[in-house]
Amino acid sequence: MENKLYVSPSPHIHGGDSISKNMYGVLIALVPAFLVSLYFFGLGALIVTVASVFFCVLFEYLIQKFLMKKEPTLCDGSAILTGVLLAFNLPSNLPVWIIIIGALAAIGIGKMSFGGLGNNIFNPALVGRVFLLISFPAQMTTWPVVDALNVFPMTYTDAQTGATVLSLMNEGVTELPSYGNMLVGAMGGSLGEVSAVALILGLLFMLWKKIITWQIPVSILATVFVFTGIMHLVNPVQYASPFVHLLSGGLLLGSIFMATDYVTSPMSKNGMLVYGVGIGILTTVIRLFGSYPEGMSFAILIMNAFTPLINSYIKPKHFGGK
């Protein structure tokens, strides 16, 4: 398969990496988070993930084969990765028929309507998530109770409702999960949102393998930390600690695995920093002042739209240029 994704200005030197190698590298990085979701959510996590991957692959095959009249490119792993990332943005008790709709939105609208891999403007998995969130808000915001032996005692008020940390904060609850529970994943949430440790392990693996660079995740996390920290200092009763924001919701999942998508993020390092700061600001504003407790998905999609503009104004000096 030919390689079409270039994420830096010319000249281009082939580094030995391929699309499929990077895609499967990201999938390996997601394994720790998947294992944690299996531990805490059991069979539901497996069903959601398998269904999401299967239908994402199926829809990509059907669209490429019968609508686009081209040879399917399933071996590159992009449809599998989209399916896993979509599943990681879903609750473990979501009905399969809703997952099918999400997979169709992710692949059909978010990816193939733009021409396929390398041409899409928005992150396909997030297109699927937001489509489901708007279409089925009740099902998308109902999480099962965590059913596993908790390493750290759960003392917060709504432990038996499966509520997420962000929804608790949005409702004004001050007794939140311990940092220990947020680190290991003993709290309500979507499959890929529950364990900070597992996600950070994935980040370290991708940095080690040079699948991604540090600019986007670090700029997002630093921006959220700074602005939520300022608000916490101003009013610690109303606004939670910045550490709570870092460890809860989809912030880590989004900043590590979603915002770093090659196709929908800027090419230059400075552009990545601007992009990451933008995501961090939008996420903070939505979390603190919006009616919906989590803003990561919306923030990434909004900044995806600005990526072409960032690329046109912020780019490194061309080789040999002045």
Regions of interest found by a model, annotated:
Residues 122-200:
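Long hydrophobic alpha-helical segments that form multi-pass transmembrane helix bundles
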Residues 121, 125, 242-249, 272-274, ...:
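Loop-to-transmembrane alpha-helix initiation sites
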Residues 1-57:
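N-terminal signal-anchor module of multipass membrane proteins
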Residues 43-55, 93-102, 182, 186-196, ...:
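Structural signature of hydrophobic alpha-helical transmembrane segments
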